[in-house]
A protein has these predicted regions:
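Conserved active-site-proximal phosphate/metal-binding subdomains
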Residues: 1-110
Length: 110
C-alpha cells in the first residue's frame, strides 16, 4: 500500500534514473535509496558496490512497503496517476474512450 501511495503522490519531477553506470538503468521514484545510488555513481564506486546496494530493494518496496530504502520502480507517467483502481475498470475506460474517438474520426471515402 505504501508503494501505491508513493506513486499517487508522485509529481513530474519525482523520478530519477539510477544504475546507468552498471549498464542496468532503472527509473524510480526519488528516495533515500536513489540518493545513495547517485552518490555512489558520481563518486566512481565499483559496479559491484552499486549492484550490492540494489540487491533485494524491489522486494523491500513491494513486499515490505519500505518507501525510503526500497526500489520504487515507476516511469515518467506515474505523475498522471491519481488513484488506485482495478485493472478491469481502467481497461473498460480505455476501450470506451477509444470507441468514442473512433466514432468522431472523419470518414474517408475511397
Amino acid at each position: 500500500q505504501n508503494y501505491k501511495q508513493a506513486i499517487i503522490n508522485a509529481r513530474d519531477r519525482s523520478n530519477v534514473v539510477t544504475g546507468r553506470s552498471t549498464g542496468h538503468p532503472v527509473r524510480c521514484l526519488r528516495n533515500k535509496l536513489t540518493a545513495r545510488f547517485e552518490e555512489l555513481e558520481t563518486s566512481g564506486a565499483s559496479v559491484e558496490d552499486i549492484e550490492k546496494l540494489g540487491t533485494g530493494r524491489l522486494r523491500a518496496a513491494v513486499v515490505d512497503g519500505d518507501i525510503e530504502w526500497g526500489s520504487l520502480m515507476a516511469g515518467q507517467s506515474s505523475a498522471l496517476i491519481h488513484d488506485v483502481r482495478p485493472a478491469a475498470e481502467i481497461l473498460q475506460n480505455m476501450f470506451a474512450e477509444a470507441a468514442d474517438v473512433i466514432t468522431r474520426l472523419p470518414r474517408f471515402e475511397s
